[in-house]
């Protein structure tokens, strides 16, 4: 079984890791992309990625100083511990013990515009390159054409080694698309999370992202490898709904409560990792209840 996740824009390198580390599978391809990005001025980066001048300059500096990392350093640490976006608030990788991290290393994969695919302990340097970026390379006009079938082959080979056909999709469409058209014998399962709002259950993006991380954590901690076992996921008030689900899209429902949202907002604001977007999303969700 392989679980795929999206990366995050928010990164944190201010931690010490006692875990082992590994090296990304496609460092040579990453270097090719960086060499292209190194030729671009901050204004070009801002235009290409829709960034502010400040963020464009930050990433210009990142590209100029980037080099393939094979050792832990202040700016080269395990990927799943570095990412701190909404999904990773749910995952809380920093709390995993060695046995849990070993399970994650085998089963979790993070899709990446720069690295293609990352294992949790693969060393990663700070970067910004979303999969949907229309960066022209010798392989084509965007990153999907650059990566071609490399990422898919990597995942399929790993499933073959594990003698499994189960692929759990906890990634955003922008990233999952890099896997292309998968063989029909691969069982792709896409868990969906809905919260009760204004009289109906619906997908609330901010909560759904956190729920993806929660499910990843739950799978790791319970060492789940069978599809049917996913039905037992019950963290943070979510419950499996047989009536709402299909064979490939298990749906989990939660009747959100305003006090819980307010408590989460308080903890989010006090966290150094919280992004302004995440905070505003919680405020909007709370007000609308």
Model-derived features: positions:
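Low-acidity, Ser/Thr- and Arg-rich intrinsically disordered low-complexity segments
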Residues: 261-281, 285-289
